[in-house]
Regions:
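A short amphipathic helical element positioned immediately N-terminal to and/or at the very start
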Residues: 1-11, 113
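ABC-type nucleotide-binding domain
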Residues: 325-583
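An intracellular "coupling" helix at the cytosolic face of ABC transporter transmembrane type-1 domains
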Residues: 11-14, 99-103, 119-132, 136-140, ...
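Transmembrane helix-loop-helix hairpins at lipid-water interfaces of multipass membrane proteins
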Residues: 10, 16-73, 77, 150-155, ...
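Hydrophobic alpha-helical transmembrane segments of ABC transporter permease domains
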Residues: 21, 25, 29-33, 58, ...
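Short intracellular "coupling" helices and adjacent cytoplasmic loop segments at the cytosolic face
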Residues: 47-48, 83, 91-115, 119-121, ...
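Helix-loop-helix
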Residues: 49-53, 144, 148-165, 176, ...
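Juxtamembrane helix-loop junctions of ABC transporter transmembrane domains
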Residues: 21-22, 29-42, 63-110, 114, ...
Length: 583
């Protein structure tokens, strides 16, 4: 895990190497100060030698200045290395997430990925900075101070050893269980972020159903769970300071009592006893810094583990060994396809699906909620892979294509329309970033979006808020259809993408498709039969199985589900949910 993380230091390796070097040298300078002070007392003050006082006083000042300079440099390079390291981690995670399939995203959840890229990376950044400085400075302090203590005090140095053993035992008893608690803490962060994200993104629904109280209660429960875990962890960590103070006071009492006897018997000088007090504080401060570092490491270890999970996750859509670089045409074939979601119920949502679509043909797909209409079409641009069977586009298995090539030729308007902050032109050019304004206007007219765009004061330069919150549902759908058309794809998939559009506009869009893009294979998922009845063929899905396939007229004669829904819709307000099974 550590090797994986450190590999992302990149251009900040130099700063990461210089930081511990300067921190170690700073610690050495600090350790020299008590010995120099001992010379000032023994050679200067007790003997009344002003020259010795000035000489060793100047040396003390120079050592302190050098230590200060080294500390500043260590701090500068530590900040540079840790900040750059965190940036590289976020970049690497973000880049890897871009290659995830929908199944990979389902595994972590959106809120979980956000937590890992923000809170978890910040924890690792802080821990890395502390490791670079304290975890180098403190051990150097500890080793050199112990060495100097043994050199000066001899048997008195056993006091230091007892203190070190005591504190190491206490720290070990605290840290081991605390690590597991922090692992649960960050899982609770995921739940908290999910609650916030869901509430904010659906705030209009929350308010319209007067569910503020329920959402507040749900958020409070998530906060309380996080609070309880943190209190549990901090309660254990709270033993750290009392243990440290016990060691400090115990060492001071023991050293004062035994040290005074050694001075009276002439075994050590007053200056050396003073130096021993300085070294014992050095040792205990080093242990305190290490304990703080261990606390930070305990928190960040769980975060580091979660970050590595994201970095190690590989897409479950493996690339083809010899990828096909061109889609010949828009012909589509499903051959005995079965599919299930890896992180779902484990039951197949599509069962033994077999049918084909000719290039340029229009296929309508209808079925009840949970009949797997969206799941079916998501296999065409390879957003998921089939569990068994084969999906072909242009006569080639979709798994044999270069994924970018395939998706450039299969343009899909998802059921959940997404617009990004930027102008209307910016959003349309997601389909083709090099498209001219004239091309954008042309596809907007095909999608019947031009009529409302022209009513905006800034027309195509009108600013769209994040998520398209300042346009209506129907307007959003027409903009996303126009965006898909701008790619000039061989296959166009509309996943219930005209549900918020009135029937007259829906008819205009379908007419424009027939007249302007006859060579493009079109797949239209809809609840309204009027949206698909002009299609060359209509596929009826029921509980993940094909219940019927034919023209509008053929299905009216042969398919019971289609007949009943057609009759209910022509008589008023019928839909497929009355026939379609629940998934």
């Amino acid at each position: 895990m550590i090797k994986k993380l450190v590999s992302h230091l990149g251009e900040y390796k130099r700063a990461a190497v210089l930081t511990p070097l300067f921190a170690a040298l700073e610690a050495v300078m600090d350790v020299l100060l008590p010995t120099i002070m001992a010379f000032i007392i023994d050679q200067g003050i007790e003997k009344g030698d002003m020259n010795a006082i000035l000489k060793y006083g100047l040396l003390t000042f120079l050592v302190a200045v050098v230590a200060l300079a080294l500390g500043v440099l260590a701090g500068k390079y530590a900040a540079e290395a840790s900040t750059g390291f965190a940036g590289n981690l976020r970049d690497a995670m973000y880049e890897n997430i871009q290659h995830y399939s929908f199944s990979n995203i389902d595994k972590f959840s959106t809120a979980g990925l956000v937590t890992r890229m923000t809170t978890d990376v910040t924890n690792v950044q802080n821990a890395f900075q502390m490791i670079e400085r304290m975890c180098v400075r403190a051990p150097v302090h500890l080793v050199f101070a112990l060495f100097m203590g043994v050199m000066i005090g001899g048997p008195l140095s056993l006091i230091f050893v007892v203190a070190v053993v005591f504190l190491v035992a206490v720290l070990a008893g605290i840290m081991v269980p605390t690590f597991h608690i922090f692992d649960r803490v960050f899982k609770n962060y995921d739940a908290l972020n999910a609650s916030v994200q869901e509430n904010v993104s659906a705030i209009r629904v929350v308010k319209s159903f007067v569910r503020e109280g329920f959402e507040n209660e749900k958020y409070t429960k998530a906060c309380q769970s996080l609070y309880d875990q943190f209190v549990n962890a901090e309660s254990r960590l709270s033993f750290n300071n009392p243990a440290m103070l016990t060691a400090v006071y115990g060492c001071n009492i023991a050293l004062s009592w035994l040290g005074a006897k050694y001075v009276l018997h002439g075994a050590i000088t007053t200056g050396q006893l003073n130096a021993l007090f300085g070294y014992i504080m050095n040792i205990l401060m080093a242990l305190m810094m290490l304990s703080m570092a261990f606390v930070m490491i305990s928190m960040s270890a769980a975060s580091a583990k979660r970050i590595v999970e994201v970095l190690d996750e590989t897409t479950d859509l493996p690339p083809a060994k010899q990828p096909v670089q061109q889609v010949k045409d828009g012909g589509i074939e499903f051959e005995h396809v079965t599919f299930k979601y890896k992180h779902g119920s484990g039951q197949p949502v599509l069962n033994d699906i077999t049918f084909s679509i000719k290039p340029g043909e229009t296929l309508g797909i209808i079925g009840g909620t949970g009949s797997a209409k969206s799941s079916l079409v998501q296999l065409i641009p390879r957003l998921y892979d089939a569990e068994s069977g084969t999906v072909k586009v242009g006569g080639v298995d979709v798994r044999d294509y270069n994924l970018d090539v395939l998706r450039r030729e299969v343009s899909m308007v998802l059921q959940k329309n997404v617009l990004f902050s930027g102008t209307i032109l910016d959003n349309l050019r997601w389909g083709d970033e090099n498209a001219s304004e004239e091309e954008c206007i042309r596809v907007a007219k095909l999608a019947c979006a031009d009529e409302f765009i022209e009513r905006f004061p800034n027309k195509y330069n009108t600013w769209i808020e994040q998520g398209g919150s300042n346009v209506s549902g129907g307007q959003k759908q027409r903009l996303t259809i126009a965006r898909a058309l701008l790619r000039k794809p061989k296959v166009l998939i509309l996943d219930d993408s005209t549900s918020a559009v009135d029937t007259a506009t829906d008819a205009k869009i379908r007419k424009a498709f027939r007249e302007e893009i006859p060579g493009t294979t079109k797949i239209i998922i809809a609840q309204r039969i009027s949206s698909v009845q002009d299609a060359d063929r209509i596929l009826v899905l029921d509980n993940g199985k094909i219940d019927g396939l034919g023209t509008h007229e053929e299905l009216l004669k042969t398919n019971a589900i289609y007949q009943e829904v057609y009759n209910s819709q022509t008589q008023g307000s019928g839909d497929f949910d009355k026939q379609g099974g629940e998934q």
